[in-house]
Structures are given as structure tokens and as C-alpha cells.
């Protein structure tokens, strides 16, 4: 189960091209070495880095741009003897009740956040892939950086801290959600970029409303993505940054219209087949190649 909050803003999308290859190569060489940390790919797509919570070091953190709020495994909260309080959050297609706690400090790479409120859950029950993780780091903490660069070829993440003097006190409470504009059979759709998802999830009712004549083949009901139950189908005419292709999608009924307005689903970063992704939280843009 992935626990989500609300997306309060979206970002524009830019694509890497051969003309700016020299510029994008500078992203890594220009980075100060302490800002670059290694990561491992868990399950072929989850980005896992080492982090610290309080005095607990060597913890496994998963960086997840599809989660608005960070989630800490319950055993970590128990080891820190933290007081829990219940609260409701939105999770893909419904509201769920989860516990929250105040953590003294959280650190991954050069990023250190103090006195932060985060969700607490039993991650092993949420996902087989993230069950070994100690925390899922969502946009609330990722957006305390100015930029996040994910380099799949070298298995490095570059985290550039913000200028604390330029960041408003309330900015941490308003994480940005990065969206990707794609074409489905000639129609524009908008998908949330999700490093914590492998494939493509579409809200079927929103897609059919946007594209009444949408063509789907090989539909199979009773499919599961974690705890989510929906169906799978082959979607022809899907285009991101290249020729159209047929893709397999997971279809789910969307939330009510005032939740995630204008969002048609989620795009797992593995679907981009990118070597490098850069998220710029200050300019509110994203690039990949």
C-alpha cells in the first residue's frame, strides 16, 4: 500500500535532446561530491539509499516521488519510543486512517530535516518490494532539496540542498507533484511521475471521459497491484517522447473529481527507460533522457 496525500502543484516537463547533451552532462560533474550518494535498484525500479533517523544509522530509505508524505516503518518508531496520533490521508482511490509521529531528525545524503511529522506504517504489509525498507521518503522531504538528479547508469543520486534563507517556512508543507504529459491515441493525458511504481496506472473512468472512443485490448479483470484491485489491458497509441507504442496498463476507478483534479493516473519512471532524470523543485520542471 502506498500512502498518499494531496498534490498542491504540478511541474512543467522538458526533455533532454542531443543539442543539450553537453549541458546535461554537467549535472553530474558540477555536483559537489558530498551531494552525490549511491543507490541500489530494488525490484528493478525502487531507488534505495542509506539514511539516518535520530541515532539510528544505516537505515534503508526508498525515494518515492509518487508519495506526497514520507512513511516510516512502525518498528523504527517503536525503537525511538515515539507517540503516535491518527490522521486520514488519501491513498490512490480512497481515504485511509494512518498513524503519525514527530521525528527529531531525518538525514539522507546532504539532506537533514529536523522536527518533521511523518506517517508510520508496517511497510512489510504494504508491499513485498518495500517490506525490507525502513522508510519511504516522499515529496515532503524530497522537496527540501533544490534539485534531485537520478543517474541510473552510475547508480548515483545527486541531492542539492536548498538555500535555507530563501525557503519559506510553509514551503515544506506544500510538496510539488511532478507530472508528465503523454499522448494516448492522439489525446493529451497527464500522469504523476512515480519512482515508486514500475508500470503505468490509469484511472479508467477519467480516461474514458477524456477519450470516449479509447481503444483497449486484452482486458483482464481481477488483477492486483499491491492491495489495489482492478484490471490490466493493452493500450495502443501511447506516446511520450518518441514513436507511438502499445503498453500494458493497470486500470483503476479514479477518486472523486475534486481529488487529484486533472490527473489521469501514474507513470512509473521505469516506463521512461531513462538513463538520467532531474527534478528541479525550485524551477518546478523535470528533464530526462
Labelled PLM ranges:
Residues 5-15:
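Bacterial N-terminal signal peptides
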Residues 16-289:
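Pepsin/retropepsin-fold aspartyl endopeptidases
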Residues 1-3:
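N-terminal Sec-pathway targeting helices
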